[in-house]
UniProtKB/Swiss-Prot annotation:
Family statement: Belongs to the U1 small nuclear ribonucleoprotein C family.
GO MF, any single term: mRNA binding
Pro residues: bias regions: 63-92
UniProt keyword annotations, A-Z: Acetylation, Metal-binding, Nucleus, Phosphoprotein, Ribonucleoprotein, RNA-binding, Zinc, Zinc-finger
Cellular component GO terms, alphabetical: Cajal body; commitment complex; nucleoplasm; nucleus; spliceosomal complex; U1 snRNP; U2-type prespliceosome
Modification sites for Phosphotyrosine: 8
Annotated protein name in UniProt: U1 small nuclear ribonucleoprotein C
């Protein structure tokens, strides 16, 4: 009868039966070995990505970012389209949307941020306070369960 070899633990089990494998795979040392294996694997993947990116940058395949170096003397960098600024040639200045004037140097809130207080022209809700916004946005669960990759030598996944 063939023995079962666990690549994570680098050991043979006494015999190849589902109960022995299940007991082994639920053990503390096996779980630590699996965790260590995948931790090392992730570190190797990250280092590989860093090395590839560095090599591509040194070969000139990746251009430097536009704001990595200071602009040349006398150069004016236009503001991004989402930020207020003086109108550019050929552009009409944006009219204000009928609300109260903005505080100087404040500007509208960034996209995705809610202003504090009621909207212009709206009264606060009954009770006198605004409802609290929930904490950080929740991530939705993946569309299907994620599968843990198996290594060579592991004949069947744990159940």
């Amino acid at each position: 009868m063939p023995k079962f070899y666990c690549d994570y633990c680098d050991t043979y089990l006494t015999h190849d039966s589902p109960s022995v494998r299940k007991t082994h795979c639920s053990g503390r040392k096996h779980k630590e070995n699996v965790k260590d294996y995948y931790q090392k694997w992730m570190e190797e993947q990250a280092q590989s990505l860093i090395d590839k990116t560095t090599a591509a940058f040194q070969q000139g395949k990746i251009p430097p970012t536009p704001f990595s170096a200071p602009p040349p003397a006398g150069a004016m960098i236009p503001p991004p389209p989402s930020l207020p600024g003086p109108p550019r040639p050929g552009m009409m200045p944006a009219p204000h949307m009928g609300g109260p004037p903005m505080m100087p140097m404040m500007g509208p809130p960034p996209p995705g941020m809610m202003p504090v207080g009621p909207a212009p022209g709206m009264r606060p809700p009954m009770g006198g306070h605004m409802p609290m916004m929930p904490g950080p946005p929740m991530m939705r669960p993946p569309a299907r369960p994620m599968m843990v990759p198996t290594r060579p030598g592991m004949t069947r996944p744990d159940r």
